[in-house]
Design a protein with these regions (language model features):
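Catalytic-core helical/loop segments in enzymes performing group transfer/polymerization on anionic/lipid-linked
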Residues: 1-318
Length: 318
C-alpha cells in the first residue's frame, strides 16, 4: 500500500477505528491494567494497532508465538528497569537532602532530561515556559514535581543531577521521597501480572478487525511502560496528602499521565488535575485527545488547557 492508498484508507476507516477501540474499552475491566494498555491508548509510536488497522494487516505469525516471544522480552527489560529504579531510589536517599519549605498546595508536574541538567548546571525546561513566572508574579507558592528522564542505563548520573537541583531555591518534590519499601513489592507484583492481564482484552475473532486487534494487543506487550506503574504508585501517595489542591501537568495524555490521573482520581475527590497541552497537535496523534469515556474510566484530567481554539474538543465531561 503506497502513501496515497494509506491516506485513503485512513480517511475511510478512522471513525471505525475510534469506535472499535471505544467499544473494547467500554467492555473491559476498568482497572490499572486496562488504563496502561498501549493498544487501547492508540499512540501511533507505541502501538502496532493504528498502522495495522489502516493497512488492514492482521499479521502472519501465530498469536501464541507472538505472546511467548514478547513475554520473554518483557520480563528481561522490566526486571532491568526495576533494578535501575531501585538504584535511583538509593541514590536519591544518599544525595538529595533538600526538603520542601512550604505546605504542598499547588504542584507543577513536569519532566527533566538528566543529561541536560548535568550539562547546564541548572534546571531550566522549555515546555512550561512562563508558568513559573506567572505563579511568582501573583505570589502563589508552588512545588515542582520533577520526573528525571533518560537515566536508566546509568543511574549514577543522578548523583550530579540531585546536587544541582538541591541548589535551586524553588521547592522540588520527587517520587522517591514518598516511596516505601513495600512499593517495590507492589511494582514487582504489577509487573509480573501485566502480560497475563492483557489476555483479558483479547476479542472473539469474528471479523478481520478483531484479528488485527488481537495480534496488535499481544505484539504491544513490548511497548509496556515501566514508568506507568511508578507514576501510578506516585499518584496513590499524592492522593493521601490532604493539603494538595491542584496539580498542573505537562500532558500528551500518554500512559504515564493516565496511570497518574487514575491513581489520584480513584483515591481523592478534592485534588484538581489540570493537563497542559501547550504544543502543536495533529489528528493522528490519537493518544493526546481526551474523551468522555476516559473521564468515566478516571484516567482523564479534570481540565485540559490547549494551545488555541482550534484544539478545543466538543466534550461533555472534560
Amino acid at each position: 500500500m503506497n502513501p496515497k492508498q494509506l491516506n485513503n484508507s485512513y480517511q475511510k476507516t478512522k471513525d471505525d477505528f475510534q469506535h472499535y477501540i471505544d467499544n473494547v474499552k467500554r467492555n473491559s475491566p476498568w482497572d490499572i491494567y486496562t488504563i496502561i494498555n498501549p493498544t487501547l491508548i492508540k499512540n501511533p509510536y507505541a502501538s502496532e494497532l493504528p498502522k495495522r488497522f489502516f493497512l488492514n494487516d492482521a499479521g502472519q505469525v501465530n498469536n501464541t508465538v507472538v505472546f511467548i516471544k514478547n513475554l520473554f522480552k518483557f520480563y528481561l527489560k522490566n526486571t532491568y528497569l526495576l533494578v535501575s529504579y531501585l538504584m535511583a531510589f538509593a541514590i536519591y536517599k544518599l544525595y538529595y537532602k533538600k526538603r520542601v519549605r512550604d505546605e504542598l498546595k499547588i504542584i507543577i508536574d513536569t519532566f527533566s532530561l538528566v543529561d541536560n541538567v548535568n550539562k547546564n548546571g541548572e534546571f531550566n525546561e522549555n515546555y512550561l515556559t512562563g508558568i513559573y513566572e506567572l505563579f511568582e508574579k501573583y505570589n502563589t507558592n508552588y512545588a515542582i514535581l520533577l520526573r528525571p528522564c533518560q537515566f536508566a542505563k546509568n543511574p549514577f548520573k543522578l548523583r550530579h543531577f540531585f546536587k544541582i537541583i538541591s541548589q535551586d531555591k524553588r521547592d522540588f518534590i520527587f517520587e522517591y521521597e514518598l516511596l516505601k519499601l513495600s512499593d517495590f513489592f507492589t511494582l514487582l507484583s504489577l509487573m509480573l501480572l501485566y502480560p497475563f492481564k492483557t489476555l483479558r482484552l483479547l476479542q472473539k475473532e469474528v471479523s478481520k478487525e478483531d484479528k488485527i486487534f488481537n495480534h496488535s494487543l499481544l505484539a504491544d506487550i513490548k511497548y509496556f511502560s515501566f514508568d506507568s506503574l511508578t507514576r501510578y504508585i506516585l499518584g496513590k501517595h499524592l492522593s493521601k496528602i490532604d493539603s494538595i489542591e491542584k496539580i498542573f501537568s505537562w500532558s500528551e495524555f500518554q500512559v504515564i499521565e493516565r496511570s497518574f490521573n487514575y491513581a489520584i482520581r480513584k483515591n481523592s475527590q478534592k485534588i484538581e488535575l489540570k493537563a497542559l497541552q501547550f504544543f502543536l497537535n495533529y489528528e493522528v496523534y490519537f493518544n493526546s485527545y481526551v474523551d468522555d469515556l476516559d473521564d468515566d474510566m478516571l484516567s482523564a484530567p479534570h481540565e485540559v488547557f490547549v494551545n488555541g481554539r482550534y484544539y478545543i474538543q466538543n466534550r461533555e465531561k472534560v
